Amino acid sequence: MNKKTKRMKKIKEHINFAKLHHIDETIDLLKKSSTVKFNESIDIAINLGINSKKSDQNIRSSTVLPNGIGRSIRVAVFTQGDNIAIAKDAGAELIGMEDLSEKIKKEGVDFDVVIATPDAMKIVTQLGQILGPRNLMPNTKLGTITTNIAEAIKNAKTGQVRYRNDKNGIIHATIGRINFHKNEIKENLNVFLESIKKAKPPQSKGIYIKKIVLSTTMGVGLMVDQSTLSL
């Protein structure tokens, strides 16, 4: 057993995984239990009181985290005319129409977000089999189908997180990195949870946010005591 495995085993022996942890304790334990050399992401899983089998209770939205998520985001923009210069000035890595579509078909996906102006969607929809499974298809709700290209690129670059529930009614997202200051993680978490609350379907009854778990890429997952959050 190597040193990292021994350290992780020792840490796990002192963690009560059945306990609801204060948010400060949760972050401290996640930082303490990080044993890998790379900067792990801090991920959140939220169990919601929704019926995912009913389309009117499924959630799909986005929010911009105040402290970003700790990594650079590559943006592809489908647009034309004057918007090409605007997209370039805003920092988009890939810009085009049919030419960009052909590039993606031949070379695959090497970007994190796709943004499109409405007039470009006829081309983008033809990439459905490529973009759809990767959850990259532009969407009006997410602000990725827009006439305001500059704002959409800025949001994507500065910490916009897109989310949707899975078939079990759970939302998964990244809200930061292990090297973030505790307050930065808490600020991101509060903004994310506020967005989740606003996205609550009117048809959802009973307890809406049932469980919150924070974890790291290669580390442990801890349940958070919601009474210690700014909900």
Swiss-Prot record:
The gene is rplA. InterPro entries: Ribosom_uL1_bac-type, Ribosomal_uL1, Ribosomal_uL1-like, Ribosomal_uL1/biogenesis, Ribosomal_uL1_3-a/b-sand, Ribosomal_uL1_CS. One of its GO terms (molecular function) is structural constituent of ribosome. Part of the 50S ribosomal subunit. It comes from the Bacteria. This is Large ribosomal subunit protein uL1. Pfam families: Ribosomal_L1 (PF00687). HAMAP family: Ribosomal_uL1_B. The keyword RNA-binding applies. Gene3D superfamilies: 3.30.190.20, 3.40.50.790. Keywords: Repressor, Ribonucleoprotein, Ribosomal protein, RNA-binding, rRNA-binding, Translation regulation, tRNA-binding. One of its GO terms (biological process) is translation. One of its GO terms (cellular component) is cytosolic large ribosomal subunit. Belongs to the universal ribosomal protein uL1 family. Disulfide bonds: none annotated. Binds directly to 23S rRNA. The L1 stalk is quite mobile in the ribosome, and is involved in E site tRNA release. Protein L1 is also a translational repressor protein, it controls the translation of the L11 operon by binding to its mRNA.
